[in-house]
Amino acid sequence: MHFSSLSLPLTALSLVTPSLAYPQFKFEQRVARSNSSESRANAVKEAFVHAWDGYMQYAYPHDELHPISNGVGDSRNGWGASAVDALSTAVIMGNETIVNQILDHIATIDYSKTDDQVSLFETTIRYLGGMLSGYDLLKGPASNLVKDQAKVKTLLDQSQNLADVLKFAFDTPSGIPYNNINITSHGNDGATTNGLAVTGTLVLEWTRLSDLTGDTEYAQLSQKAEDYLLNPSPKSAEPFEGLVGSHINISNGAFADGQVSWNGGDDSFYEYLIKMYVYDPKRFSTYGDRWVKAAESSIKHLASHPEKRPDLTFLASYNDGQYGLSSQHLTCFDGGSFLLGGTVLDRDDFIQFGLDLVKGCHETYNQTLTGIGPESFGWDPKNVPSDQKELYERAGFYISSGAYILRPEVIESFYYAWRITGQEIYREWVWNAFVNINKYCRTDSGFAGLTNVNAANGGGRYDNQESFLFAEVLKYVYLTFAPDNEWQVQRGKGNKFVYNTEAHPVRVAA
């Protein structure tokens, strides 16, 4: 799960007309002709450098570039989110110049200073995850990229500095943290509950920090919060075995509801259950067991096939006896999660179900005019908009929000499908998505979001470039065509790295 870096509703974001953001057609034509894995990997590198150069020219050291106006954004506290989020991708691409630029920047960050509210979740997955990943990669398989190892050590030092700034968030009666905090006053937003994903997507990064530093406090804080999610109460919080509610009371750790989904707000809790098992199957066997229960219950209770396209599979939501037939781009990580769990646990049923989910999410790309999927969609026959009946009859779904803000989840699951099956079709799906993003989102200085993926030219443009373009979209596309390496996802139990929800790979403990 990633919140948009802009807090306004998508309909109210800064828009420009398509004419102001036409793609660079010469590049588009060159990309479309790339056939070999090497040429495709190089095309992704070019896109990364294009976006990086625009960010450095117009927005550094701010958090985001506004890639149409060439303005800046500071949605992530002004610490240079795009730079930190780009580090692990630059390392994997072997770009020594950019890696060292980012290391020099990270050494200058003062994480104790910001004028804005801090999100514990977003700061953990982007900044802490990005620095820990850079450390693991540069101390290991990419150590040749940095001559001065003191720069690499700074990544771990700054990770600990950041965690020390954030850790007061866990100082609550239950240990369930506040998410929205003021690091200057040690205050919070007064929330009485925290979300499932926001609470349950800290444990990988904070545990890795403890394992690297030898200071167990960070792991203990995140794992204490996670324990409430692994052992939910009351019973109504777990309507199906392994599937739990969406909100947890900060005062006592009890769940406040039994609303179940894999959508944004819940998603990465389930993602991290199996990833913690991959990180260390001995220490986190319970996490793996809980993921299996959630996966089995999802297949049994949440799998949903659109009336007009029974060949497609999506995951519905559930609340108090009612099913919600709607989903999101965010949810499309689910295929990759089932594929990872299936290969690690040697469960062919999970692999097959994961591929079914991947096929469904691919169709949300395949059926739009741009070949890019929407922010949200539904398949409830009672709720089909009158102007989308043709789409619903043909595709089996209708679009609830046609925005695309450079999200990675569909490409992410295509990547997992490629790595775990070896079937070329999934690489082609990745490539097609990348070509279309280049065609419709590329600007003179970076990449912009789209207002309507099912309109000519993608509708208007959002004048914002999320940091996860660097961290996730371009990384997963590049990895799909890059040579094998120990940071690549592996079949079976051979993974040397595991990816956090921002696509930052950290070395497994086992």
UniProtKB/Swiss-Prot annotation:
Q: In which pathway does it act?
A: Protein modification; protein glycosylation
Kindly list the cofactors needed. Ca(2+); Mg(2+)
A Pfam family matched in the record? Glyco_hydro_47
Q: Does the keyword Metal-binding apply?
A: yes
**Cystine pairs:** 332-361
Assigned keywords, A-Z: Carbohydrate metabolism, Cytoplasmic vesicle, Disulfide bond, Glycoprotein, Glycosidase, Hydrolase, Metal-binding, Signal
| GO cellular component assignments | cytoplasmic vesicle lumen; endoplasmic reticulum; membrane
- GO terms (BP aspect): carbohydrate metabolic process; ERAD pathway; protein glycosylation
InterPro entries named among the record's database cross-references = 6hp_glycosidase-like_sf, Glyco_hydro_47, Glycosyl_Hydrolase_47, Seven-hairpin_glycosidases
Summary of temperature dependence: Optimum temperature is 45 degrees Celsius. Activity remains at about 60 percent and 14 percent at 60 degrees Celsius and 65 degrees Celsius respectively.
According to the record, how does the cofactor bind? Ca(2+). Can also use Mg(2+), but with lower efficiency.
| Activity dependence on pH, as recorded | Optimum pH is 5.5. Activity is above 50 percent between pH 4.5 and 6.5.
- EC numbers on record: 3.2.1.113
Q: Which residues are glycosylated?
A: 35, 95, 182, 249, 366
Please state where this protein is localized: Cytoplasmic vesicle lumen
Positions annotated as active site in the UniProt record: 375 (proton donor)
What are this entry's molecular-function GO terms? Answer: calcium ion binding; mannosyl-oligosaccharide 1,2-alpha-mannosidase activity
Q: Which reaction does it catalyse?
A: N(4)-(alpha-D-Man-(1->2)-alpha-D-Man-(1->2)-alpha-D-Man-(1->3)-[alpha-D-Man-(1->2)-alpha-D-Man-(1->3)-[alpha-D-Man-(1->2)-alpha-D-Man-(1->6)]-alpha-D-Man-(1->6)]-beta-D-Man-(1->4)-beta-D-GlcNAc-(1->4)-beta-D-GlcNAc)-L-asparaginyl-[protein] (N-glucan mannose isomer 9A1,2,3B1,2,3) + 4 H2O = N(4)-(alpha-D-Man-(1->3)-[alpha-D-Man-(1->3)-[alpha-D-Man-(1->6)]-alpha-D-Man-(1->6)]-beta-D-Man-(1->4)-beta-D-GlcNAc-(1->4)-beta-D-GlcNAc)-L-asparaginyl-[protein] (N-glucan mannose isomer 5A1,2) + 4 beta-D-mannose; N(4)-(alpha-D-Man-(1->2)-alpha-D-Man-(1->2)-alpha-D-Man-(1->3)-[alpha-D-Man-(1->3)-[alpha-D-Man-(1->2)-alpha-D-Man-(1->6)]-alpha-D-Man-(1->6)]-beta-D-Man-(1->4)-beta-D-GlcNAc-(1->4)-beta-D-GlcNAc)-L-asparaginyl-[protein] (N-glucan mannose isomer 8A1,2,3B1,3) + 3 H2O = N(4)-(alpha-D-Man-(1->3)-[alpha-D-Man-(1->3)-[alpha-D-Man-(1->6)]-alpha-D-Man-(1->6)]-beta-D-Man-(1->4)-beta-D-GlcNAc-(1->4)-beta-D-GlcNAc)-L-asparaginyl-[protein] (N-glucan mannose isomer 5A1,2) + 3 beta-D-mannose
User: Where along the chain is Ca(2+) bound?
Assistant: 501
Q: Where is the signal peptide?
A: 1-21
| Family to which the UniProt record says this protein belongs | Belongs to the glycosyl hydrolase 47 family.
This molecule's function is given as: Involved in the maturation of Asn-linked oligosaccharides. Progressively trims alpha-1,2-linked mannose residues from Man(9)GlcNAc(2) to produce Man(5)GlcNAc(2).
Q: What is known about its subunit structure?
A: Monomer.
Q: What is this protein called?
A: Mannosyl-oligosaccharide alpha-1,2-mannosidase 1B
Q: Which organism is it from?
A: Aspergillus oryzae (strain ATCC 42149 / RIB 40) (Yellow koji mold)
Provide the taxonomic classification. Answer: Eukaryota, Fungi, Dikarya, Ascomycota, Pezizomycotina
Gene name? mns1B
